Design a protein with these regions (language model features):
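Gly/Pro-rich turn-and-neighbor structural signature
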Residues: 1-72
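Structured mid-domain segments that build the active-site/substrate or prosthetic-cofactor binding neighborhood
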Residues: 54-58, 64-166
Length: 166
């Protein structure tokens, strides 16, 4: 039934855009139960981007296999800095250290899950440091090897508060 729904959606895309569905960017977020459907064999066309998700605790649940990396749609990651849900919510407080973000997004980069990165940030103010690191790393992962992570925080603090307070 779900695969029929995907086929119907693609037909609607073609009807509404006048283009073949494969020429219109599409994403399938493998979040929570949807990843379970995928693991049990549900598939979408190869031109659809597979968006791998974290476990709501900053651990990417799964990354693409070599066969999945060969799909023309590619792969990406949906990541959380803010989460509301069971068994515990975390808001208004940064609970994801920069090294953890680096580790997980570095894995995503190594496994070619880099076509799209989305981060759920919740409230912006308490997440300034992780948001900026996430975007900086996404822009140029090679510029930020693990050895430079302490330098990142020093540079950020110097810019925000002055070198004497960094």
């Amino acid at each position: 039934l779900l695969q029929k729904i995907v086929q119907d959606q693609r037909a609607l895309i073609e009807k509404d855009t006048g283009k073949p569905a494969g020429e219109v960017p599409q994403v399938w977020a493998l979040y929570k139960e949807v990843q379970g459907y995928y693991e049990k064999g549900m598939r979408v066309p190869d031109d659809v981007l597979l968006l791998w998700c974290d476990d709501n605790w900053a651990n990417i649940r799964r990354l693409p296999t070599p066969e999945e990396r060969a799909r023309p749609g590619g792969a990406g990651v949906y990541y959380h800095f803010d989460y509301v849900g069971g068994p515990r919510s975390y808001k208004w407080l940064n609970v994801t250290p920069i090294p953890k973000i680096w580790e997980q997004m570095h894995l995503a980069w190594q496994y070619d899950a880099k076509r799209m990165w989305i981060v759920n940030v919740g409230d912006l103010k308490p997440m300034e440091v992780p948001i900026e690191f996430f975007l900086t790393y996404a822009w140029n992962p090679a510029a930020w090897p693990a050895e430079r992570l302490p330098e990142y925080l020093r540079l950020w603090a110097a810019r925000e508060f002055g070198a004497e307070h960094a």
